[in-house]
A protein has these predicted regions:
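Beta-strand-loop-alpha-helix segment that lines the small-molecule cofactor/substrate pocket
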Residues: 58-60, 65, 71-72, 76-123
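Short, structured coil segments at secondary-structure junctions
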Residues: 24, 45-47, 85, 188
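N-terminal Rossmann-like dinucleotide-binding module
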Residues: 1-45, 361-364
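NAD(P)-dinucleotide binding in Rossmann-like oxidoreductases
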Residues: 204-207, 222-299, 315
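C-terminal helix-rich "cap/oligomerization" subdomain common to oxidoreductases
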Residues: 65-68, 289-291, 296-368
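Short, Asp-centered acidic motifs that coordinate Mg2+ and/or phosphate
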Residues: 30, 65, 145
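Conserved SAM-binding strand-loop segment of SAM-dependent methyltransferases
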Residues: 48-54
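Predominantly a Rossmann-like dinucleotide-binding segment in NAD(P)-dependent oxidoreductases
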Residues: 122-205
Length: 368
């Protein structure tokens, strides 16, 4: 029996709690949250032990593993505390708000021989998994260009008041939406060698971004165009799409289907033929023991629990792989000018920069 502690009772925490309680061979030994009222209701109707602090839960619950679903800024200290106690960790994405911290936590987990996983659920979607399989088979040859997209109706009017509306808390389109497709890019093609032309635009939000666009340069010379918008009311819910062009064909995938075009002369994998091929998520996704929101959410938790039970360190979405995505996110922030690094550029106040620019323009006009 794997004893699991759930930390955080927001949207994702409640979702994870309902799913992990339904898994065979799992005992939820406690739930941690700062909201006493919410804990009281949960304790009354489920009988699950509840704790107001992580310290107390670790003293009394003795978990084998923990699911961390708190606001993103709290991930790093909580995950470090759990690892120091020898506890396997499933952490919601992004792992942390600092690539350096993510690297440190990945190294700490490796040193202690602990199972880790981050909640990039798209790697458990049948269509996206099939993309990875086809790329491993070199079905479309060398990838020369791609388009990574995510759209959704999250922020459709000015709003404040939650951590998701503040970049410093880990909120915003880049951390919440773009992270998912960037993680798929890492999975499919490795780490890009450069990013450029990044824009992070606010549509309705005051303190964070609602749209992200960029160009990612691949080590082999190809490129990926990134287009993400969580203020798009034309879609009913989050929609993630990947399109890849290669020397031997083209792949398009979203959650519902994968479309593959193979050029004549390209040896097709089993189940495919030259020209257009279409496969649907219903034929690519195995049935799960419990359904809520999507098969992939249960699948990722089953994968984590199985690895904890067997002590398998290698797996899908480990801390080490998630740290790559955190570093890519950091590169995009720097490229967009949202994060000024003193080592990269002097910290010039906006007023001084504007005055300096005005002086240069006047000198050019005078010279003419």
């Amino acid at each position: 029996m794997v004893k699991v502690l759930v930390v955080g009772l927001g949207k994702m925490g409640i979702s994870h709690l309902s799913m992990v309680r339904a898994l065979c061979g799992v005992e939820v030994v406690g739930v941690v949250d700062a909201n006493a009222y919410l804990l009281g209701v949960l304790r009354k109707y489920t009988g699950v032990a509840t704790y107001g602090t992580l310290d107390r839960a670790l003293e009394e619950a003795a978990p084998d593993a923990a699911i961390v679903a708190t606001p993103s800024r709290l991930h790093a200290p909580m995950v470090r505390q759990l690892l120091d106690c020898g506890i396997a960790v499933f952490c919601e994405k992004p792992m942390t708000l600092s690539a350096a911290e993510s690297d440190e936590l990945a190294e700490l987990a490796a040193e202690r021989g602990l199972v880790t996983q981050v909640g990039y659920h798209n790697r458990f979607v049948g269509t996206f998994t099939e993309v990875r399989r086809l790329l491993d088979l070199e079905a479309i040859g060398s990838v020369t260009h791609g388009l990574a997209e995510a759209y959704g109706p999250v922020v459709l009017k000015p709003a404040t008041g939650t951590w998701r509306s503040k970049r410093t808390e880990g909120g915003g389109c880049l951390y919440d939406y773009a992270a998912h497709v960037l993680n798929l890019v890492n999975w499919y093609l490795g780490q890009p060698c450069a990013v450029g032309g990044t824009t992070m635009t606010s549509v309705f939000s005051r303190e964070t971004d609602d749209q992200v666009a960029s160009t990612l340069t691949l080590p082999g010379g190809g490129s990926i165009a990134l287009s993400v918008n969580w203020s798009d009311e034309s879609v009913r819910k989050m929609t993630t799409r990947i399109t890849l062009w290669g020397t031997g064909g083209r792949i398009f995938a979203d959650r519902q289907e994968i479309q593959v075009y193979l050029r004549d002369g390209t040896p097709p994998p089993d189940g495919y033929q030259p020209g257009w091929n279409v496969k649907y998520t219903t034929e690519l996704t195995p049935a799960e023991s419990f359904y809520l929101r999507g098969e992939e959410y249960t699948a990722q938790l089953e994968h984590f629990v199985t690895r904890v039970r067997t002590g398998t360190l290698e797996g899908i979405n480990t801390f080490a792989s998630a740290a790559e995505t955190d570093r890519l996110i950091e590169w995009l922030r720097r490229d967009a000018g949202q994060h000024r690094d003193p080592a990269l550029a002097p910290d010039v106040p906006n007023g001084v920069a504007r005055a300096s620019l005005s002086a240069r323009l006047r000198s050019l006009v005078t010279a003419r």
